[in-house]
Swiss-Prot record:
It comes from Arabidopsis thaliana. This is Probable E3 ubiquitin-protein ligase LUL1. Belongs to the RING-type zinc finger family. LOG2 subfamily. CDD domains: mRING-HC-C3HC5_MGRN1-like. Signal peptide: none annotated. GO terms for biological process: protein ubiquitination. The gene is LUL1. PANTHER family: E3 UBIQUITIN-PROTEIN LIGASE LUL1-RELATED, MAHOGUNIN. The RING-type zinc finger domain mediates binding to an E2 ubiquitin-conjugating enzyme.
Length: 337
């Protein structure tokens, strides 16, 4: 009985007594220069329970994503500065590609003095008044100094612009001297014309693979000083015969200029007439419509732009603004130089 009462008393005293505080254990110290890694890192919960992580049922603020930037005209995003795209030489700012400039070049023309020039549009065949079956060669030319013109039938040309007649026995070359002057008229002497009916069509109409031209005219300017014989200026005009509606006509296929022992081929430039005739009509650049045109597009030979627009065109397109053919070269021509 006494033991039972003592046990009850002891239990009651334990209930009234305070619970002793838990023993504080020192934190586990890791040795220096030691690292602890998880053998298998746990996977993160894609749908975490924010109630357990934040006491008091206080949810974190919603995660805000960066706003989408507007589209540009190329329908490409403007990425932030720290984007994942790497710079590239063909990309502007790492966002969209740009085309490299065209490969054609922009050059300035070099002035070459031509002392004698045959106007090829005036070259024609006229009937001989004394011999209707024969035709005479006629043309107009300009000369800044005296010289000599040679008309050769069925001629061949060497590398130094020398003509040789292949039918010299029946059609000898015709040579005459001229003086200085513009707009001079040449007409072959009567009785020395050519009878085209005496030749076959294979001889009159030049084949592609032959070097013989049915007609060639050599205009040579001779300086007055004897010591300047090495600076002779020569122009060769190569002519072929064509037949239209039964009538035989002549057509200039090429003009060669020989200056200082160098060979040049003369080509027409379309649009240059409007820039040198003194008229203000039609001489403006076709791009800006304000500056005078001074640049020619090759190989189509359209003189249609000013030098400023031609330089800007190199970085935009490689097509001629007139005929839309591909551009290989831009040639700037200074009319005052």
């Amino acid at each position: 009985m006494g033991n039972l009462i003592s046990l009850i008393f002891c239990c009651g005293r334990r209930q009234r007594s305070n619970i002793p505080p838990a023993m504080e254990t020192a934190p586990l110290e890791l040795p220096p220069n030691r690292f602890v890694f998880a053998a298998v890192p746990p996977y993160l919960n894609p749908n975490p329970n924010y109630v357990d992580q934040y006491p008091g049922n206080c949810l974190p603020p919603p995660v805000t994503e960066p706003p989408m930037l507007p589209y540009n005209f190329n329908h490409l995003h403007h990425y932030p500065p720290n984007s994942y795209q790497l710079p590239h030489p063909l990309f502007h700012g790492g966002r969209y590609p740009i085309l490299p400039p065209p490969t054609y070049v922009h050059q300035k023309a070099v002035t070459i003095r031509n002392d004698v020039n045959l106007k090829k549009k005036t070259l024609t065949l006229i009937p001989d008044p004394e011999n209707p079956n024969r035709l005479l060669v006629s043309f107009t030319f300009d000369a800044s100094m005296p010289g000599r013109i040679t008309v050769v039938f069925f001629a061949t040309e060497d590398a130094e612009c020398n003509l040789r007649a292949t039918k010299e026995d029946t059609l000898p070359p015709i040579t005459f001297d001229f003086g200085e002057g513009l707009g001079q008229k040449f007409i072959q002497s009567s009785g020395t014309g050519i009878d085209l009916t005496a030749f076959k069509d294979s001889e009159l109409f030049k084949e592609v693979d032959t070097d013989v031209f049915p007609l060639a005219v050599k205009a040579e300017a001779t300086p007055a000083e004897e010591g300047k014989s090495g600076s002779t200026n020569v122009q060769i005009t190569q002519v072929v015969y064509t037949k239209e509606k039964g009538e035989i006509k002549i057509e200039v296929v090429k003009q060669i200029l020989w200056v200082n022992k160098r060979r040049y081929e003369l080509l027409e430039i379309y649009g240059i007439e409007n820039t040198v005739d003194g008229s203000d009509e039609g001489k403006e650049c076709v791009v800006c419509l304000s500056e005078p045109r001074d640049t020619t597009v090759l190989p189509c030979r359209h003189m249609c732009m000013c030098s400023g627009c031609a330089k800007a065109l190199r970085f935009q397109t490689n097509l001629c603004p007139v005929c839309r053919q591909p551009v290989e070269m831009l040639l700037e021509i200074n009319k005052n130089g």
